[in-house]
């Protein structure tokens, strides 16, 4: 099993988005390992843990190939772990997947409400591009 950390910071990221303390200024200046994105991980290249707003930047860095990811487990519905607006980019016209398998998200009812709102708005579940599967703790 391959487990890759894509982000290990808290909600504000590191350095913090609107912070100008000495630690954040130094982290910005040094870059590299001194900069951390919001929490996210990838298991065996196919299972994504969380979908934060940093997901797009991770694809640009070459650390994440979303065309290979089939499943995404949302640990909880806080905005640093779930940014459902990015699901719109799975729409016809934005995404041309190599196959027709859906991107399946798993999460609690709370996460499901946020995800389904986006899926409904863009017709993503009806066209089979994205599916939400509710789960309960310890299932």
List PLM regions with ranges.
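Binuclear metal-dependent hydrolase catalytic cores
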Residues: 1-139
């Amino acid at each position: 099993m391959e487990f890759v950390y894509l982000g290990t910071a808290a909600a504000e990221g590191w350095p913090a988005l609107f912070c100008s303390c000495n630690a954040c200024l130094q982290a910005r200046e040094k870059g590299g390992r001194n900069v951390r994105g919001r929490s996210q991980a990838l298991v065996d290249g196919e299972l994504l843990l969380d979908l934060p707003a940093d997901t797009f930047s991770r694809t640009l860095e070459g650390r994440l190939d979303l065309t290979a990811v089939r499943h995404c487990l949302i640990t909880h519905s806080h905005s640093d772990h779930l940014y459902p607006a990015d699901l719109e980019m799975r729409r016809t016209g934005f995404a041309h997947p190599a196959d027709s398998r859906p991107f399946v998200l798993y999460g609690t009812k709370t996460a499901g409400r946020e995800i389904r709102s986006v899926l409904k708005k863009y017709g993503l579940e009806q066209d089979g591009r994205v599916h939400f599967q509710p789960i309960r703790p310890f299932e």
